[in-house]
């Protein structure tokens, strides 16, 4: 079985050797560069965008993550709000070797969003299988072929929907669906009452869409009183609800402490509330240990590629090289 060979490779310590990773991922990086024109052409066909825009997308979302994975050693993880060129930071959950990793991508998630996460897992020294069940595109098909040709099967591979997953006993399954009981707020606004109102509205919509009813809300200490007030408002608006929509609201100090609290809860559904700086919106879209439901109470599903591209172009967070 492939996972037996993966286990042997991981236990040998070879996957955590920088030279081995550099050689393996370096070949993929070289192939990605060699196929630049083909990839840009496929992007133009898949996305219906100009060649100039697709060159920009290739540079930031394909070539740069591949270069980082091939040429840089895994650095100490930092809690920073990443911008789009730093897409490799989606792998922050892989800041240390975990063993055999299975990535089960959400069916709504574009291939360009999961490919850097696959590279990040390999970069951390994890034998990794990416199971992609989303819409097949020419770009995704080409990148899959390049990855599977360059990376030894016992180190990593990409399989499409319908193909057999050659990993029966992974140490870590990275999936997009996190059923659970926790609703978490990582950042509020200066106007806490308004932010809390948006949060409760998004939560109500989320419950209707996903069937998730949070039993606990963790939030920054500064937002606690505003959230309690908004929950009380919803309770008064829903007299037929036996529990009055009231749930415990626990204030936690700081992102780090809040993240540790959520990790201790195990499986969960985390509802993020972001507003204000654009970097917060980017972070909620890129951080993957917890599934998000709302960015500024607008979207309750995986972000669209168009939103990413427009945001990047308008704010000039990516520069063409």
Where are these regions (language model features)?
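ALDH superfamily catalytic-core signature
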Residues: 146-151, 170-256
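Conserved small-residue-rich beta-alpha loop and adjacent elements
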Residues: 82-150, 180
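Conserved acidic residues
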Residues: 99, 169-173, 215, 268-269, ...
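N-terminal Rossmann-like NAD(P)+-binding subdomain of aldehyde/semialdehyde dehydrogenases
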Residues: 1-92, 299
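Donor nucleotide-activated moiety binding/catalytic core segment of transferases
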Residues: 87-102, 162-167, 244-246, 264
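Short beta-strand elements of ligand-binding domains
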Residues: 159-160, 175-177, 293-297
